[in-house]
Amino acid sequence: IWHPYTSTLTPLTCYPVTNADGVYLELEGGNRIIDGMSSWWSTIHGYNHPVLNEAAHSQIDKVSHVMFGGITHQPAIDLCKKLLKLAPDNLEHVFLADSGSVAVEVSLKMALQFWHAKGQPRSKFLTLRDGYHGDTFAAMSVTDPDNSMHSLYKGFLPEHIFADSPKTGFWDEWNPSDIDSFREKLSA
């Protein structure tokens, strides 16, 4: 297997997982580690969650997967209805994507299509330095080209506008000057 973020010539060590429960991954040999990445942010409720397991078992016996190209299914409809109840009233549509990278990719395409439909085609995005948006081509283009694992692709990706990222810590009081760079780039 050619795993992500490693070379085929000098591959990084991969640790075989034999079980997963809650936040823990059990490795071959019995060691347990905390999955701080939540399997690339896809298991935010933990592994082996009884409600999610039951839903998956129930669904797999009916329909494992269908594409949304002209067809749909009730679980997707039900999920979208629940999401819309949580959303502000002016948000009336839900687009389901199969990964964060694809969600970013589709969002960028939607923004481009929006301006094209208004007769004002645009091709640049304003984004923050030190951000990460995924591994698909367009998602990499709005990820910091200098300070990220995608710096190898600088010069090959479309160039966008990068503002300094805010420096206020997560628990600190917000400092409005943190987004001065963003304001300057936006008004340029």
Where are these regions (language model features)?
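PLP-dependent aspartate aminotransferase-fold enzymes
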Residues: 81-188
